[in-house]
Amino acid sequence: MTYEVKSLNEECGVFGIWGHPDAAKLTYFGLHSLQHRGQEGAGILSNDQGQLKRHRDMGLLSEVFRNPANLDKLTGAGAIGHVRYATAGEASVDNIQPFLFRFHDMQFGLAHNGNLTNAASLKKELEQRGAIFSATSDSEILAHLIRRSHNPSLMGKIKEALSLVKGGFAYILLFEDKLIAALDPNGFRPLSIGKMANGAVVVSSETCAFEVIGAEWIRDLKPGEIVIIDDEGIQYDSYTDDTQLAVCSMEYIYFARPDSNIHGVNVHTARKRMGAQLAREFKHEADIVVGVPNSSLSAAMGFVEESGLPNEMGLIKNQYTQRTFIQPTQELREQGVRMKLSAVSGVVKGKRVVMVDDSIVRGTTSRRIVQLLKEAGATEVHVAIGSPALAYPCFYGIDIQTRQELIAANHTVEETRQIIGADSLTYLSIDGLIESIGIETDAPNGGLCVAYFDGDYPTPLYDYEEDYRRSLEEKTSFYK
């Protein structure tokens, strides 16, 4: 496995429901609320009295289920669903989840959000023992581990399998008589439990999906925890005691929808606090604040309230383009920036603009937006980022594969400022980020994973370790 060339990272959305006669349709609505987490493919798997049925395909959820018959056939009171964005594997339906596994004595489905850091080693070992993989993502590994376990009970098999996989993961599994969800020992990826008026139980990557189907949040799944949902109700269990909360800080910064709550913290509120703290750390004179739509608008509001500068709509987003960070190729990302934003000359002309954005990954978007604002007549553009400098890869489930593609890993703040063409560049401090999010916990770093900013990973990197250490010695120039 070569870390620089290929990673298995995914950023996806998972949803499941047990105990509702329209389970698949509600899963469709739930996935619609999670569409921002992945647009490459989607699928739904239903349970109709023990019979598992599935439809999946490439594209947006609405495209996958454009024919109503594909959803109508997914009858039953239980269902799981998945929206996918991935860097692993070919762009084919084989990699679209949920996966469905049929054996002579059982069948089950699986949906996964995250990335396994020991996937290559596990896959090699399993293949040497005769396992045959039908997809190229790491999500299939858990099913093989479950099936090959010698533990006599199903829960014993699942616990054993979960203890063998490492990294970041949120799994939802659908069996003939139950739905099971599990979270990694650090809770890198969020997973919440909700309940509907009729007693149906819902599991989702984000709480925003509960609102659209009328479910009430019960609680978030804890690190290392398993929830078993069947006709008898809800049962919580764990597969390890070696846990420590380190939820991905990028969920609060960028990925999650503003109306979602993660570990008791509303995402919009956290972003506003990030913006306010950013304003306190900002040291330049300016006339107006312009937030980059849409994920930066909450931070811009906080910046405005703290700084006293007026908030202006200096950038307009075409709502029918996809998010550039989760476009699968760099060429598409650059095209996406050109398509999705335009500057309002009547607002920014002759003004010193504070451009508030959530993050700088490759610098593609920032450079283009600064150019747009200056072409529209802004006299100065001061870029203020509502997160620390993103200088290290993520191995737990985000498409940040290598240091070579991170501008902050290869250039100083001043060099980055020059590359994007800004008059100044200010990043939020790591301490400011942790304080702004404010999870109530005594875990290190306020219960957050901030390894993308300081390189201090909360777990061993396993298969990635050797190549990652080597990459620390390499540099890539972003100057053009």
Each model region followed by its residue ranges:
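Conserved short alpha-helical segments that host acidic/polar catalytic motifs at enzyme active sites
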Residues: 1-223, 228-286, 292, 380
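A short acidic (Asp/Glu
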Residues: 55-56, 183-184, 299-302, 393-395
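PRPP-dependent phosphoribosyltransferase catalytic core
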Residues: 162, 177-178, 214-220, 314, ...
